[in-house]
Design a protein with these regions (language model features):
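Beta-rich carbohydrate-recognition and catalytic domains
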Residues: 1-68, 77-143, 157-189
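Short glycine-rich, acidic/polar surface loops and turns
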Residues: 138-140, 148-152
Length: 189
């Protein structure tokens, strides 16, 4: 599923699909993030709200890096603190609605933490992207506003490999080694 993020966990050093309350759980959506459950990974039932409409997990926020859209990225991960969902956020091009610290129209990566017992309940959401277009190859090509569009996440040999599209022109990988301290990105004011 291009815009779907099924919940996984780490088991014996590998990322595997896991169930939440006896069902597989998937976050999905290309403007806002919704959710669905399945017994068999083939047939999915969207989660609806009290009005019988799609229940929203997150949606775009004015004046934030994800002001134009929020779209699911790689598989979500069940941790001891909750479910971590990485997502793609697009900044508005309209100056009154966008986050002016980042390029208008840029795609950046955000993350939320949801309650593992209530996966629709957001416990935390980053107000700034954890990954944004900074390298020249992420800001040239077909999408010059800048794009890091995260799609794949692999846990391999105790490191995380995050595969992403760069300016809609190539694919790259960012590697995170939890054993090494790395300085954080200095977000502009």
């Amino acid at each position: 599923c291009k815009s779907g993020s099924m919940v996984t966990t780490i088991k014996d050093g590998k990322q595997v699909l896991t169930k939440i309350d006896g069902k597989y759980f998937m976050y999905w959506g290309e403007h806002a993030v919704y959710a669905a459950t399945s017994d068999d990974l083939v047939n999915w039932t969207p989660i609806l709200d009290e009005k019988n409409e799609l229940a929203t997990v997150i949606k775009p926020r004015p004046q934030y890096f994800d002001s134009a859209l929020t779209e699911c990225g790689p598989p979500a991960i069940l941790t001891d603190k909750g479910i971590v969902l990485l997502y793609n956020g697009k900044n508005q091009t309209n100056d009154s609605k966008r986050d002016k610290r980042f390029t208008a129209g840029a795609y950046c990566a955000g993350q939320i933490l949801t309650d593992p017992k209530e996966p629709m309940k957001v416990l935390q959401r980053l107000d700034v992207p954890f990954f944004r277009p900074m390298a020249s190859f992420e800001k040239s090509g077909q999408y010059v506003d800048g794009t890091v569009f995260i799609e794949g996440l692999v846990f391999f040999k105790n490191k995380w490999y995050l595969y992403y599209g760069c300016a809609d022109s190539q694919v790259s990988v960012a590697i995170y080694d939890p054993a090494k301290k790395t300085p954080g990105d200095q977000i502009p004011n």
